[in-house]
Amino acid sequence: MVFEKIDKNSWNRKEYFDHYFASVPCTYSMTVKVDITQIKEKGMKLYPAMLYYIAMIVNRHSEFRTAINQDGELGIYDEMIPSYTIFHNDTETFSSLWTECKSDFKSFLADYESDTQRYGNNHRMEGKPNAPENIFNVSMIPWSTFDGFNLNLQKGYDYLIPIFTMGKYYKEDNKIILPLAIQVHHAVCDGFHICRFVNELQELINS
């Protein structure tokens, strides 16, 4: 893992960062419809497939890898790792696991299945211990679909990393649609960036 510190004085987002981080702290969320027909028709496992696809786009663009590290420094990670929740039916609680990214889905799926098998019965909130600092959070609410979703981070205005939440998929006009909520910090991510993410995610799923 490499964390490259940002020189704010030469950074092209300096005035935007200062405005949305300090003057007017601002996070926002967008909920979009993702066409997952190709995933279902190929018989791929939905959750790990979406984790993989989301991670691929996150790691393409620096705005989704920009963070304040544990030393309070602003910078960009060279890679982000998905941290995802699994649900425990017996206690109605969840645990967070994480799986390192791989360049191909087959390898990622093997590691994902290994992690869920090894740590899936650990009912602690941190199901797989020793999560690295370069993680981003993904969760799924498979019991209901939604048109809007928002996380309220009362003390989280210094949290720059995106958060992804998926809902229950449904059929619409011969397509299978998955709601996806994306929460970002305006200091590092504008509407253009989140829309580019959505478009590239859909293109990757369709390819």
From Swiss-Prot:
SUPFAM superfamilies: CoA-dependent acyltransferases (SSF52777). The keyword Cell membrane does not apply. Signal peptide: none annotated. It catalyses: chloramphenicol + acetyl-CoA = chloramphenicol 3-acetate + CoA. Disulfide bonds: none annotated. It comes from the Bacteria. GO terms for biological process: response to antibiotic. Keywords: Acyltransferase, Antibiotic resistance, Plasmid, Transferase, Transposable element. Its EC number is 2.3.1.28. The active site is at H186. InterPro entries: CAT-like_dom_sf, Chloramphenicol_AcTrfase_AS, Cmp_AcTrfase. GO terms for molecular function: chloramphenicol O-acetyltransferase activity. This enzyme is an effector of chloramphenicol resistance in bacteria. Homotrimer. Belongs to the chloramphenicol acetyltransferase family. This is Chloramphenicol acetyltransferase. It comes from Clostridium perfringens. The gene is catP.
